[in-house]
Amino acid sequence: MTSSLSAFINSLLWGAIVVVIPLSAALLFISQKDKIQRN
């Protein structure tokens, strides 16, 4: 594997991490709030 390819894969991984973690945290937070409001 070339260094540019590994850097590309690395940036893809970090991009996924940076996007997915806040998104799932927000979804969890919203679903928890929604559950409280409905009951």
Curated annotation (Swiss-Prot):
Keywords, sorted A to Z: Cyanelle, Membrane, Photosynthesis, Photosystem II, Plastid, Thylakoid, Transmembrane, Transmembrane helix
Annotated Pfam families: PsbX (PF06596)
Major site of localization recorded for this protein: plastid
Domain of life: Eukaryota
Transmembrane regions: 11-31
Keyword Thylakoid: yes
GO terms classed as biological process: photosynthesis
Compartment list: Plastid, Cyanelle thylakoid membrane
Membrane topology according to the record: Single-pass membrane protein
InterPro entries: PSII_PsbX, PSII_PsbX_type_1_subfam
UniProt keyword Transferase present: no
GO CC entries: cyanelle thylakoid membrane; photosystem II
Stated role: Involved in the binding and/or turnover of quinones at the Q(B) site of photosystem II (PSII). PSII is a light-driven water plastoquinone oxidoreductase, using light energy to abstract electrons from H(2)O, generating a proton gradient subsequently used for ATP formation.
UniProt similarity note: Belongs to the PsbX family. Type 1 subfamily.
Subunit structure and binding partners: PSII is composed of 1 copy each of membrane proteins PsbA, PsbB, PsbC, PsbD, PsbE, PsbF, PsbH, PsbI, PsbJ, PsbK, PsbL, PsbM, PsbT, PsbX, PsbY, PsbZ, Psb30/Ycf12, at least 3 peripheral proteins of the oxygen-evolving complex and a large number of cofactors. It forms dimeric complexes.
Protein name: Photosystem II reaction center protein X
Provenance organism: Cyanophora paradoxa
